[in-house]
Amino acid sequence: PADANEVAAAWRAIMADAGHPTALILSRQALPTLDRTKYASADGLAKGAYVLADSENPEVILIATGSEVSLALAAHDKLVAQGVA
C-alpha cells in the first residue's frame, strides 16, 4: 500500500473476503499519508489498481506501486509545474 489510507482499504477488503489466504505486505519506511482531497480515494484499491491523478490529454503516464507512489506523485507535481500534462 502507498499510505495509511490504502492499508485501511486493503484491510477492509481482506476482511470482507476472508475465505482464502491473503498477505498484506507493508513497507518499513515512514510513508507520507497522501492528501485524498487532491488525489483519488483509496477505495479504488479493491480493483487492484487505480488512477490517483489524471489529466485530459496526458503527455506522460507515471505508474507506481507501494512506497514508490509518493515519489511518482512528486514527479507528477513537478511536471505539472513545468507545463507537462
Residue ranges and their predicted role:
Residues A85:
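Residue-level detector of anion-binding/catalytic polar loops
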Residues A2:
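TRNA-recognition modules of translation machinery and tRNA-sensing kinases, especially anticodon-binding
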Residues N5-K78, Q82:
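Glycine-/acidic-rich phosphate or pyrophosphate-binding loops and their flanking alpha/beta elements
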